[in-house]
Amino acid sequence: GHLYNWYNTWDLKTLSPHYISTVDSGNFFGYLITLKNGLDSIRKAPVVSAASLKEIEHLLLPQGEVNRLKDDYKTYNELAEDLFYVSRNLGQQPDYASSPDARDFIRMSGIIQNEIERLDLGQRMLCENLSLHDLVLEGNPAALAEIDRIKRMTDTAETMISDVSFKALFNQKRKLFYIGFNMSSQTYDQSCYDLVASESLLTSLLAIAKGDVPVTHWQRLGRPLTLVKGRPAYVSWSGTMFE
């Protein structure tokens, strides 16, 4: 099903009016798909990838040669110790320690250090392709637990995805999506999203892909053009940054 738009963040009780938004439901559905695919990719993704090391090294560029990572770590322990050493040094430099780059470096290096410790990788030779899947095949108990946790989250996301239907938010006569549905009054909004350049674009794409609405819905979405500095541009539904 769909989530309501407003909840009390203290007890998660629904707030009035009990309203279902077409845009927010479509966005949430898209996030679930992204989450599921991301979780699936984690299983065979490197535990410590070359890309992640390059990213955190980039955060140290303002430091020049003062704090930097080596290029030739032999073991995971060497990497973890160096990350700890650099993070500690950054914390002792007030001018840089409070910067976004320093905070991001300390946070990301902490994640890598925790993974190395949790998966008991310390004495292993550093391998940029070592994945959770590889560790599971070796019988690593922490990797087995992590894969099981990922599977549970993936199953939850899949269940939530399969439970969503956009048919109830679709105006069958106009072949367009309503703005939303007010459960409290059991009424639809009178207006519909009728332009391609609108916040509901993702909802339209996903609903068509799911088979909840006909492909003809796409043709019903208007595509008015205007000139901006002499160049043609789409006119959006309400002119917001969301579009």
Model-flagged regions — what are they?
Residues 1-243:
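Acidic, mature catalytic/reactive cores of soluble proteins
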